[in-house]
Each structure stands twice: as C-alpha cells, then as structure tokens.
Amino acid sequence: LPDPVYAEVGWPRPFAHIAAAVAAGGPAARFAKEQARLWEDIAGQVPDGGRALIVSHGLFVELGAVASLPDADHAAWGEAIGYCEGIRLVYDSDGRGGTLLRLPEENRLIEN
C-alpha cells in the first residue's frame, strides 16, 4: 500500500471515513479506482457462471469495495473489514452488486 494512501486514510477505519477519502480525489481515490479496475479485469476473464477469489488485506479491500460500488451506502457498511471477512462482488449484465461478508461479532478480529 503506498505510503500516501495509508497516510490519508489509516487503518482500521469505518467505511464512511474511507468513502470520504475516496470522494476527496487524492491518493486514496486513485488507489481505490486502480483496485476496482483490477478486480473488474479479473472478473472479465472468468467464464459465464464462473467465480474468482481474490485474497487481500486491510484497506485494499475497503478501498476497492468503495470504488467498485460508488453509489452504495458506505456508512451502512460499518467498520473496517476484519480477518477472514470481505466483499462478494457480482458483475453481470444487470451491472455490478456487492454483499459484505462478515463474521459473527464475537469472532471478528481487526488488528494493525
């Protein structure tokens, strides 16, 4: 993760904070858009009906998710993604959608 992105956003931070940083148009926005493009490129290589798994870590996931779903209610997504959590993105003829994948609260772990 480039230092200017981490300096602008920090981690762990709630999705609302991350979305505000992306909206500001600085280093976090550029990185988020690059991440979203990369994920979309990977999805474009998957055959119809297929799936891909992308494994990443803190802040990469949040930034890419915000940029992939810019019209979502990011504040409703809550806190940062923890270990073994993520987002399921769907790219199809109807557009793009996503669902956060969370562990039960008692099993969540977020450390930096």
Residue ranges, per PLM feature:
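Phosphate-handling substructures
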Residues: 1-38
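Acidic, low-complexity terminal tails and accessory targeting/binding regions
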Residues: 2-9, 48-50, 63-112
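Short, well-ordered alpha-helical segments in soluble proteins
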Residues: 19-22, 43-46, 68, 72
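N-terminal start-of-chain detector that recognizes signal peptides
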Residues: 24-27, 59-63
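Aromatic-acidic/polar surface patches that form glycan- and anion
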Residues: 28-32, 54, 79
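A short, acidic, amphipathic alpha-helical segment used as a generic capping/interface helix at domain edges
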Residues: 35-48
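Beta-strand elements within well-structured catalytic alpha/beta cores of enzymes
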Residues: 46-56, 60
